[in-house]
């Protein structure tokens, strides 16, 4: 899978080339995925050999997924020029997962403009 921000940059590159339809398709792909999977309940299936790792690192994967979906929607909105919406999505991701580094990076980028 491609990193999410790579899809944003592909869209921005298409935008620079005047290929607006291709650009918007990339941005909406990010937003659509985030919207479609925001409420997913994530359960990890694992083999018994990995059980000790899961017992040590008890993460809430549904919460992480929700944060990631907000991040994706933030990226898509950056591409569409909706920076206030993007900031709101990044803030939601950070509230859900304070260590979501990329949401912090892109929130800072949006606020610096």
Segment roles from a protein language model:
Residues 3, 20, 37, 66, ...:
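Residue-level recognition of tetratricopeptide repeat
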Residues 34-41, 97:
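Alpha-helical junction/boundary sensor with strong preference for TPR arrays
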